[in-house]
Amino acid sequence: MKAEATVIPSRCARGQTTAAPGVQPWQTSVPQNTTQPKLLAPRQHEKSQKRSSLLKELGAFHITIALLHLVFGGYLASTVKSLHLVVLKSWYPFWGAASFLISGILAITMKTFSKTYLKMLCLMTNLVSLFCVLSGLFVISKDLFLESPFESPIWRMYPNSTVHIQRLELALLCFTVLELFLPVPTAVTAWRDRPSAKNDDACLLPNTPSHLKGLPVEPPPSYQSVIQGDAQHKQHQRLREVKQVTPDTWIVTDGAGIWTQTAN
């Protein structure tokens, strides 16, 4: 007895169907009620990073000016003995430097940790720093222009110790003017910055599909389980179905095609 087999290719043998992205290989369409992921725009994320970097730089400027106030104020306090300087009587170089130093540290800390209470503290300290700057401008201007205790002009050929003190106070005035332009930009940048790093990370995560909400979160399948599932699926496709049409003819159907087998 000889057997002749004729292969009739089916649709599965002629070509493979391409599944839609996000579905299983045996699915032909995307499940209903599936929400497409919404990611944060790259430009918006870059703006957030630039804003955080700017906040760190502003904090560094605060700290630098605070240290300069301490250096010049300490030198003036140690050298001036006979002159009556309002800037020293009010102790402006020290409480002004403390205000600027706290503002800078909070700005850098907020950029590092990004908490809501740090944001509020940063806004409050910058507001206090602004009042300290205005007060410092008033007391220094009173020493240099309104009630000047200096007899000789500030620019002379052979300066004495009094002229050096006058120049130091003028330098302190310049640093105070620079500090005047820092509290407002720092406060605005801190206000626009995100209150928490968790919110920034949450914007980068896709939305959960509505039909998956409430289900327990499970880890993704391993590589071996995926390979085993694919092999089982292929084995399931290759299961043959034998159907006898006539006493000498059988039709065999499997995943590769339809076989017609006859016996002579």
UniProtKB/Swiss-Prot annotation:
May be involved in signal transduction as a component of a multimeric receptor complex. GO terms for biological process: cell surface receptor signaling pathway. InterPro entries: CD20-like, MS4A. The gene is MS4A10. It is a multi-pass membrane protein. Residues 17-48 are annotated as: Disordered. This is Membrane-spanning 4-domains subfamily A member 10. It holds the Pfam family CD20.
